[in-house]
Amino acid sequence: MLSKSLTKTKLIDPLILTLLQNIKVQRSKLNDLNCIEVDPKLSNIISNEEGKELYIENEFYKAKGFRKLHIEVAEFSKSLKILHCVFFPDPKYDIPIFGMDLVKVNELVSAAIVDLSPSSKNQNLKYDHLLSHIDKSVFKSKREIPIWGNIFSKNVFFASLKNESEKNAFCKIVDNYLSVLIQLSQSTSPDSDYEIIEERINYQKNYCVQQMKNEKTSLVLLKYFDKVWVDEYIKKVLFDF
């Protein structure tokens, strides 16, 4: 049975727990929020094999305007910790894709990224000004967007976090991006125009295809699972469409 709250997560990292709590608070503001149950073998995975300790827990919801609200927390070999979150909109609604990832190796946050990625042409014009006003001046180690990252908006934030001040600031940025997402979702109604719905479907497909070009995801998982399982997990859990 899929955990409905992630309250049983074994991760005790304070940064991940803070982000997780903030995301859940914002998610609770969505209308018609319901849990989605999936195959347990893909949702909650634990291994205590020495040297290959592994903990992955996934949570799936849906809501008005969103086909899938996914949160993943994971710990690999007691050193690599990951928080992954993607909110996929229902293509009938004019809502961007919220994505957030945090990668922590021991106490170093090597990657922290958040974005509202457009799910249709020129959609970002509706919210670019809201994101550009969010203060990001505190960060000293911003990272370069990967080649496949043309799916992101011009306001995508990507950095390594060097100290507590930057960690706290990143939490605020994630919260602000989610606030904009909630605001957008509450001000839109379902469309019936087939062409615009098809365009949004294609944008989400491309988002998933480009994300799957991130080889780091599969390389980590392949240390613990065979290729068949990894492919299924990436395509059915992380980036399905």
From Swiss-Prot:
Single GO molecular function: phycocyanobilin:ferredoxin oxidoreductase activity
Query: Which keywords does the record carry?
Result: Oxidoreductase
Superkingdom to which the source organism belongs? Bacteria
Pfam families to which the protein is assigned, alphabetical: Fe_bilin_red
* UniProt enzyme class: oxidoreductase
Disulfide bridges in this chain:
none
Q: Does the keyword Oxidoreductase apply?
A: yes
Q: Which GO terms describe its biological process?
A: phytochromobilin biosynthetic process
Q: Which reaction does it catalyse?
A: (2R,3Z)-phycocyanobilin + 4 oxidized [2Fe-2S]-[ferredoxin] = biliverdin IXalpha + 4 reduced [2Fe-2S]-[ferredoxin] + 4 H(+)
Q: Which InterPro entries match?
A: Ferredoxin-dep_bilin_Rdtase, Ferredoxin_bilin_OxRdtase
PANTHER family in UniProt:
PHYTOCHROMOBILIN:FERREDOXIN OXIDOREDUCTASE, CHLOROPLASTIC
- Protein name, please? Phycocyanobilin:ferredoxin oxidoreductase
Which organism is this entry from?
Prochlorococcus marinus subsp. pastoris (strain CCMP1986 / NIES-2087 / MED4)
